[in-house]
């Protein structure tokens, strides 16, 4: 690698898995890509999100190979692994990652296959910026919930990006469980906490609030609710959160440790992941 995303030092995964990468030249972010810095790094390949397709076109015209990815579903995530594995001559690792995903997802399907509709809680996942922003049915986060044996509250919404709702809509959704993701860097909760939600008088009659079923995803690793290589851990964490009788905290912690050691080369302490 010759260049890395902006604010990489804030992301725990780099410090845990490959701290030397933090010192590479900063080429900006998905929202503010630094074309000049990228070109100056003299890359053989640039991997960009689909939203940067105009930048990719510019790089291609300059003779720099560019790969665009859009992992907004499980299928697209698997496709991304294959594309990057092929482009970087690392298909053995990509294949191992895909096989790991398929094995774990098969296990999740087996564990949840006998759940009745009544046993599947309505789950509301907030965004990193506001509890009144959630994932519509076409987002990756929605599939994470349904795969883990839940019903995404945001399925009543259309779109492929975080969608704003009002208090009335939230109250009408009346979720059984509320999930709060990490912030964008996975170092803390977002701009609000589980306590903020539980103490919000407007939400007092929401089932999840009444039952104390408001959960913060683990911080200190990665944003597991996102379509990233470790996204499978988001599904497994969700499975434990929604159905601890089917998949225990100890099982999740062991799986998280196995994943990070297998694909990143470091161990995760049991109490860090559970």
Label the predicted regions:
Residues 1-41, 45-51:
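A short, structured surface patch at a secondary-structure boundary
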Residues 1-4, 46-48, 65-71, 152-154:
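Short hydrophobic/aromatic-enriched beta-strand-loop microsegments
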Residues 5, 141-161, 182, 213-218:
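His/Asp/Glu-enriched short active-site or ligand-binding loop at hydrolase and phosphoryl-transfer sites
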Residues 27-30, 35-48, 64, 166-183:
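Proline-aspartate-enriched helix->loop->beta-strand connector
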Residues 52-61, 182-197:
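A ligand-binding cleft/hinge motif common to bilobed small-molecule-binding domains
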Residues 55-133, 154-156, 161-162, 209-273:
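Extracytoplasmic substrate-binding proteins
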Residues 110, 162-169, 197-204:
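Alpha-helical scaffolding within the catalytic cores
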Residues 134-135, 142-144, 149, 167-173, ...:
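A residue-level marker of the well-folded mature domains of exported/periplasmic proteins
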